[in-house]
Amino acid sequence: MKHIIFTDLDGTLIDHDTYSYDAARPALDLLKEKEIPLIFCTSKTRAELEVYVDELECHHPFISENGGAIFIPKDHFSIELKDVHEIGNYKVIEFGTSYTRIRGVLEDIRKKTGFKITGFGDLDAEGVSKDTGLDIRSAKLAKLREYDEAFRLEEDENATAKVIELIHAAGLNYTKGGRYWHIMGDNDKGKAVRALTEIYRQQFTEVVTIALGDSLNDLPMLKAVDIPFLVQKPDGKYDPSIILTEIKHAEGIGPVGWNNAIMDLIGKNNNI
């Protein structure tokens, strides 16, 4: 039986403020020792994820921009993959809408409403760095978006409802992460997780899926797996928008909770 772990990054595997994953090192080492695939499933861009792939030597498929696409290293699976095309060293399954169209819709909404909406595409790397706390190099990578626009909406609840209405009217969708709203196409983390899980099932037959997240944009992913975990927010609370009967609440904020969840589930089970 093959166990697979899907994980959010910001606020989950990596700390919300420091972007460090040091607190999760014991669990990361355990997964490597047991050869359990760790699949990044996040709002981050492909360019950002490649940094973590190299740093953690985690050469598995990954899911970028809230399920915008699955990037599978060439020759990773022995089975034939369907509905894929090649980009660089990857076989890619796309679910998302082009960034150009998404930006156009967001700009139209801003013009129609006059609301203060600021997306990554409105900022230079220095602006993204200041807003996120990322260093300049990381901020540049965060701007290389393909399927999703992260934005801030500095308005009241009525304005938020209006923006959501206009996003839907344009045939697009939205979600909310730890820091930003996201406008995107007909994709979410859950669709990508289910598609990638099916590929693993074709390869290994029996598969058990695990996922860890912290925010609303993780809910589709958490619904799509066998064992879902929710880690605590920086204030020590769990996101109240995550309503799922089978959810397991990891004790600890971000990577501390992530580490505890994996060590409890994997470290104490000799059969895994």
Swiss-Prot record:
Divalent cations in the following order of efficiency: cobalt, magnesium, and, to a lesser extent, nickel ions. Transmembrane segments: none annotated. Coiled coil: none annotated. Keywords: Hydrolase, Magnesium, Metal-binding. Belongs to the HAD-like hydrolase superfamily. MPGP family. PANTHER family: HAD SUPERFAMILY HYDROLASE-LIKE, TYPE 3, PHOSPHOSERINE PHOSPHATASE. Its EC number is 3.1.3.70, 3.1.3.85. Mg(2+) binds at D8, D10, D214. Monomer. The active site is at D8 (nucleophile). It catalyses: (2R)-2-O-(alpha-D-glucopyranosyl)-3-phospho-glycerate + H2O = (2R)-2-O-(alpha-D-glucopyranosyl)-glycerate + phosphate; 2-O-(alpha-D-mannosyl)-3-phosphoglycerate + H2O = (2R)-2-O-(alpha-D-mannosyl)-glycerate + phosphate. CDD domains: HAD_Pase. SUPFAM superfamilies: HAD-like. Optimum pH is between 5.5 and 6.5 with GPG and MPG as substrates. InterPro entries: HAD-like_sf, HAD-SF-IIB-MPGP, HAD-SF_hydro_IIB, HAD_sf, MPG_Pase_thermophiles. One of its GO terms (cellular component) is cytosol. GO terms for biological process: mannosylglycerate biosynthetic process. It is an enzyme of class 3 (hydrolase). It comes from Methanococcoides burtonii (strain DSM 6242 / NBRC 107633 / OCM 468 / ACE-M). Involved in the biosynthesis of glucosylglycerate. Catalyzes the dephosphorylation of glucosyl-3-phosphoglycerate (GPG) and mannosyl-3-phosphoglycerate (MPG) to glucosylglycerate (GG) and mannosylglycerate (MG), respectively. It comes from the Archaea. Its cofactor is Co(2+); Mg(2+); Ni(2+). One of its GO terms (molecular function) is phosphatase activity. This is Glucosyl-3-phosphoglycerate/mannosyl-3-phosphoglycerate phosphatase.
